[in-house]
Amino acid sequence: MSEEYERFIDVPSNHEAYMYVNKAYEMGYISGYGGMFYPDRKISFEDASVIFCKIMGLDYYAKALNGYPYGYYNAAKKFGIFKGLKTDRGNEVTYQDTVKMLYNLLNAPLVQNLKTPDSDIVVDVKKDETFLGSYYSVYRAEGTLETVGNSSVKYDSNCSENTITIDGVSYNTDKDYLDYLGM
């Protein structure tokens, strides 16, 4: 028997979530319960807050706020994980809630735990950086796509191959964004 198989006896190697559950365990985001994971069990917002705090790097901060359940719950709430959700303590997380929390995570400010000499936990919030941008180099921008290659929304626009123009700024690209022209 492999180590992975023994980790959670209710998530065998042929289970559809096997790879994801084991990766989340290896990364320290989940721990299970005495060798069981209970993949079909719904979780509460308190349990979800533990996972999201660990992903964001807020584990020590949440523990400093009295840990489980309220420290994690309050940390997740403070950093926007529950933004736009009705999160009554003890309620079960729905699929839609999970999608919203993932969206909020990706758009949350980047945070780092810093230890001070007197062992207090201080959180450094980088408001100009998001989790998504920092870890995946994906950034949100707003503007109008004016040119794609030789196509333009303006008659007198200078267009060239392998470029796009957004709000007057040109970018080199090897992708086709023609379907987004004018948006």
What are these regions (language model features)?
Residues 1-181:
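N-terminal propeptides
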